[in-house]
């Protein structure tokens, strides 16, 4: 008697296989960078055949898109909820800085590979991050700028101070703690206001 076909089970197995490949790729991108990771590396890490990786992701663009989304879904949450209970401008700025530093620490394994940042899929994610950061800056500064009209220079300088590269350069010094980095950035932003 022929075995019955279960399309739901098949679909589940396909999704699990795809997820396994994405997770292997995300880990390799953190270890080696996007441009140094081959489909052969991915197949070995995922414990699948190389053609299986190509079948699931015929082009690197689709794989990179899946990986950036996978990593982004697990990133620390950046929402206006971080300001709950924060009444002073300094408290709000400190909450924003703390959140941004957590995000930078989370994404550092991938972003440290500078050449990878020129890829369209990564650029798209970074643009989304800038938009989100701008929203949070506006929310943080709301007590000081009730109209929501923050001076352009203040917004630009705040974006610069909250940028991954600022965090990474301070982190690279190695002699200051995460808490000190957060204090430095918070103080710098508060002096601009």
Model-derived features with residue positions:
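Alpha-helical DNA-contacting segments of helix-turn-helix folds
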Residues: 64-71, 114, 129
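Amphipathic C-terminal alpha-helical segment
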Residues: 139, 155-176, 191-193
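Hydrophobic alpha-helical connector segments
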Residues: 66, 79-106
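N-terminal intrinsically disordered/low-complexity leader segments
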Residues: 1-15
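Amphipathic alpha-helical packing segments from all-alpha helical-bundle domains
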Residues: 98, 102, 106-109, 120-156, ...
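Generic hydrophobic, amphipathic alpha-helix propensity
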Residues: 13-25, 42, 67-71, 75
């Amino acid at each position: 008697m022929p075995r019955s076909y279960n399309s739901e089970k098949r679909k589940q197995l396909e999704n699990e296989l795809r997820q396994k490949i994405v997770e292997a790729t995300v880990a390799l991108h953190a270890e080696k960078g996007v441009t140094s990771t081959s489909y052969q590396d991915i197949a070995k890490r995922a414990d699948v055949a190389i053609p299986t990786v190509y079948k699931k992701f015929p082009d690197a663009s689709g794989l990179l898109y899946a990986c950036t989304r996978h990593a982004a879904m697990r990133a620390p949450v950046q929402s206006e909820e971080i300001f709950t209970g924060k009444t002073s401008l300094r408290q709000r700025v400190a909450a924003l800085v703390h959140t941004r530093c957590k995000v930078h620490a989370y994404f550092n394994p991938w972003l440290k590979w500078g050449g990878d940042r020129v890829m369209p899929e990564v650029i798209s994610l970074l643009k989304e991050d800038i938009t989100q950061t701008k929203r949070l800056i506006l929310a943080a500064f709301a007590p000081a700028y009730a109209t929501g009209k923050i001076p352009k220079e203040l917004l630009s300088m705040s974006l610069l101070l909250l940028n991954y590269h600022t965090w990474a350069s301070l982190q690279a010094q190695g002699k200051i703690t995460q808490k000190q980095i957060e204090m430095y950035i918070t103080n710098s932003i508060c002096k601009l206001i």
